[in-house]
From Swiss-Prot:
Pfam families for this protein: Yae1_N
Location(s), subcellular: Cytoplasm; Nucleus
Function, in words: The complex LTO1:YAE1 may function as a target specific adapter that probably recruits apo-RPLI1 to the cytosolic iron-sulfur protein assembly (CIA) complex machinery. May be required for biogenesis of the large ribosomal subunit and initiation of translation.
GO terms for biological process, alphabetical: protein maturation
GO CC, one annotated term: nucleus
Keywords for this protein: Cytoplasm, Nucleus
Protein family: Belongs to the YAE1 family.
Protein name: Protein yae1
Positions of the UniProt region annotated as deca-GX3 motif: 73-113
Region listing for Disordered, in residue ranges: 36-60
Quaternary structure and interacting proteins, as annotated: May form a complex with LTO1.
Length: 243
């Protein structure tokens, strides 16, 4: 009777061992990864709560690569956009800046020329009137150089962040075509100093048209040769213009 009950017990133990070894053999499938179509699940350990990825773990690189490409693409786009914007702004602002620079240079140059001529006369004359004029023109010349600096001409007071002027340009509200010389002439600082220079021109009876163009074209060749011969004969030396 004892042996009759022993065989079922052995049979049951054998069955349990077979089932257990079958479960252990399935663990080796993860070495090579799951099939492409199989889903991946997270298995949590009941002791410490750690998470282990099941199935093919290579798919976790896709979000990282996607984020990397998006970041690099954004940077490339910003870099290219900046380059195009800077070039476009330079192309649009160069013409206006050149016109402003020429007119400001003319103002500074005329004042410097008048101041230099008066300084020569003041040094040679004992009349205090020339000394007073030299002091006045010196202050005027210094003020012009200070107020017509680049950072002041292009200050936020006169220009917006988009590069558009804030001051009123004649004819703009009427819908007329406004060109760069019109904008430059309407600039408050340049308008002020061009007016002051015009007063000095009238004060000293200057003829600016005489200084324009080529002097060789204004004086015939025969007269130029004759004038040079007279200078050599008299031994004269050319000096600065003295008013």
């Amino acid at each position: 009777m004892f042996r009759d009950h022993e065989f079922p017990l052995s049979s049951g133990a054998f069955s349990i061992l077979t089932s257990e070894s079958a479960v252990l053999n399935d663990d080796f499938d993860d070495v090579f990864g799951s099939e492409p179509g199989s889903p991946a699940f997270d298995v949590r350990d009941g002791h410490d709560g750690d998470t282990f990825g099941g199935g093919n773990t290579e798919i976790s690189d896709i979000p990282r690569l996607k984020e990397k490409h998006e970041t690099e693409g954004y940077r490339d786009g910003v870099t290219k956009g900046k380059a195009e914007s800077v070039q476009k702004g330079f192309d649009e602002g160069y013409g206006l800046g050149a016109v402003l620079g020429l007119r400001i240079g003319k103002v500074i140059g005329i004042l410097e020329g008048i101041f230099g001529a008066v300084s020569v006369s003041a040094a040679k004359s004992e009349d205090t009137k020339w000394t007073d004029e030299r002091s006045r023109l010196e202050e005027l010349f210094k003020s012009a150089k200070e107020e017509l600096k680049t950072e002041k001409v292009f200050a936020r007071e006169w220009w917006g962040e988009d590069g558009i002027w804030k001051f009123e340009v004649p004819g703009e509200k009427e819908g007329k075509d406004v060109v760069f010389p019109d904008v430059a002439a309407a600039h408050p600082l340049l308008k002020k100093w061009e007016g002051l220079v015009e007063e000095e021109i009238q004060r000293w009876s200057l003829d600016l048209e005489f200084m324009e163009g080529n002097e060789e074209e204004a004086v015939p060749a025969k007269q130029q040769i004759k004038a040079d011969a007279v200078e050599q004969k008299m031994g004269t030396v050319k000096t600065d213009l003295n008013w």
